[in-house]
A protein has these predicted regions:
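Short helix-loop-beta connector
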Residues: 63-67, 166-168
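Generic structural signal for buried aliphatic residues
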Residues: 50-52
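Short, Lys/Arg- and Gly-enriched loop/turn segments at beta-strand edges
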Residues: 2, 57-65
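Ferredoxin-reductase
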Residues: 1-46, 105-106, 132-136
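A phosphate-binding catalytic loop at a beta-strand-loop-alpha-helix junction
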Residues: 69-84
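Reductase modules of NAD(P)H-dependent flavoproteins
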Residues: 98-205
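Conserved S-adenosyl-L-methionine
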Residues: 65-67, 87-99
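Histidine-anchored nucleotide/phosphate-binding helix
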Residues: 1, 80-92
Length: 205
């Protein structure tokens, strides 16, 4: 779920594809049996009422803290991070904590909610958005979108944390693919960051 409470009765769901790899040598298209949830969602019509519950769990910001906050995300993992960031800014109007979001993607066309994060950066001087794309992206260059080539954990280290006075005093919030989360955790461990300062929803395993 990507929305925050102040957005009212609108629910934004960021869904990732979990189908097996496509094998074009066997057929010209992928045969996938429709799932229960996807079949239900695609059967809905405007005006239909649905019952929802959640989200559950303990992946949320420490609201009573004044520490700097760094979010790291990618793919569908940006959904809960957007909700947290929007709540900290739009709902709580937090201006006394430094906040950074390092967003990793393969290319510009895979980036969700870009306008939201760029808008927050203009509205809140204490919020900073950092986009990391795996490699130089002509589409991003043509659009004038600022980004740094490289994997997100490398970009975060090279452009910010390596010159940070006390990276161990920062709160880190992560959600994204397993390999990304693992790389970030290893990098933070090398900087002396304690596990208690790293909060994440590692849905990628």
């Amino acid at each position: 779920m990507a929305n925050y409470p102040a957005e009212g009765d609108v629910f934004m769901l960021t869904v990732r594809i979990a189908t097996p790899p496509f094998k074009p040598d066997r057929s010209g298209f992928m045969e996938v049996n429709p799932g229960i949830a996807s079949s239900y969602i695609f059967s809905l019509k405007p005006g239909d009422k649905v019952i929802m519950s959640g989200p559950y769990g303990d992946f949320h910001p420490h609201f009573d803290s004044k520490k700097e906050m760094i979010w790291v995300g990618g793919g569908a993992g940006t959904a809960p991070l957007r909700a947290q960031i929007m709540h900290m800014t739009k709902t709580l109007h937090t201006t006394d904590r430094e906040m950074h979001y390092f967003y990793g993607a393969r290319a510009l066309n895979e980036v969700f909610y870009l306008d939201d994060f760029l808008g927050l950066e203009k509205e809140y001087p204490n919020f900073h958005f950092h986009l990391a794309l795996d490699r130089p992206d002509p589409a991003a260059d043509a659009a004038g979108v600022k980004y740094t080539p490289g994997f997100v954990h490398q970009v975060m280290l090279n452009t910010y944390l390596k010159d940070h006075e006390a990276p161990e005093d920062v709160e880190y919030y992560m959600c994204g693919p397993g390999p990304m989360s693992n790389a970030v955790v290893q990098m933070l461990d090398s900087l002396g960051v304690e596990p208690e300062s790293i909060m994440y929803d590692n849905f990628g395993g």
